[in-house]
């Protein structure tokens, strides 16, 4: 997979996409409902940003029944994965990333039917 630095940084320049990427970098895989709950944004807005990241091969999606789960594409070049990891490490205790992590951990019934229905 090929991604250039300009494309990756352009995708990360959007605050919503950056928050999603940090959550996914930290958690490994999340259901759309978990991201929607954590960021407190509408499902269509979340889906639009996820589609953009998926279409640019930064994310991979998989379906389990009616749920769609996203993860960072393991085929990203090492430098791109390192950028995401260093960004997470340097900002995990900074807002809004700290609050996002707390909101996700406080989410009841992750990722059960109650959140994904």
Each predicted region: which residue ranges?
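N-terminal helix-turn-helix DNA-binding core of bacterial DNA-binding proteins
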Residues: 3-42, 67-76
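Amphipathic alpha-helical dimerization/coiled-coil segments
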Residues: 78-117
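A cross-family signal for key residues in well-ordered alpha-helices
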Residues: 10, 22, 54, 60, ...
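Beta-hairpin "wing" of winged helix-turn-helix
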Residues: 55-64, 71-72
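Short, structured secondary-structure boundary patches
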Residues: 8, 66-68, 81-87
């Amino acid at each position: 997979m090929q991604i250039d630095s300009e494309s990756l940084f352009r995708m990360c320049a959007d605050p919503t996409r950056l928050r999603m990427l940090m959550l996914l970098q930290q958690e490994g895989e999340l259901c759309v409902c978990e991201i929607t709950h954590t960021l407190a944004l509408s499902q269509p807005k979340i889906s639009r940003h996820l589609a953009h990241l998926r279409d640019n091969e930064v994310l991979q999606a998989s379906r389990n029944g009616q749920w769609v789960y996203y993860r960072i594409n393991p085929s990203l070049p090492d430098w791109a994965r390192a950028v995401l990891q260093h960004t997470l490490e340097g900002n995990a205790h900074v807002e809004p990333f700290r609050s996002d992590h707390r909101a996700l951990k406080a989410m009841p019934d992750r990722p059960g039917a109650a959140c994904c229905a």
